[in-house]
Amino acid sequence: GYVESGMCKMIAIGIAKHFGCSWFHRQGFDTFGERIPMVAAEFLKNMNVIMGVGVVQNAFDEISEIKAYPKDKIIEGDHELLQIAKRRLPRMKFDNIDVLIIDQIGKNISGEGADPNVTGRGCMPGFEDDFHCKKMFVRKLTPPSHGNACGLCYADVTTRQCLQSVDWESTWINFSTNMMLSAGKIPVYQNTDYEALRLAIRTC
């Protein structure tokens, strides 16, 4: 869409918290591109907002751009920062690989645990157009995710240790809010990293 996971999404979904998130997801992911800027524009028109500050990170998780926009330029600025963010996304060296090993996933990295623009796996079709892996192995969750396992469903293999670190209550709340119970699926798990990696390789 014109804007994605930036200032407009924070306004349209984030400020309304659980209610806003539930309402948006009930409309369907395919409506996000149209609805997010529309709802953000309505909010900005009716609320006392001074400005918006957008932050872009690079492929090394470092802040690479900070820009402030006046109220009437926030949506336009969000689109501008989206183009910058896309240019600075991390890229795989190969377009097609057998096994992708992800050390950690978490909500602090991406709403889907790992950025689907990088991994090629997400809730919407199209991410696999630029990168494809036959099997994905997720080792663990990030500490800041506090056990929220959102995104683990995209993995083919994980470990028992990873599943034992999951806070199932917060994870189920996340899935029920976004109306995607399929996102709660659990990948095949093994007792150790070695066994998980061996299984991923053997089943390519």
Each language-model region and where it sits:
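Hard-cation-handling environments
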Residues: S110
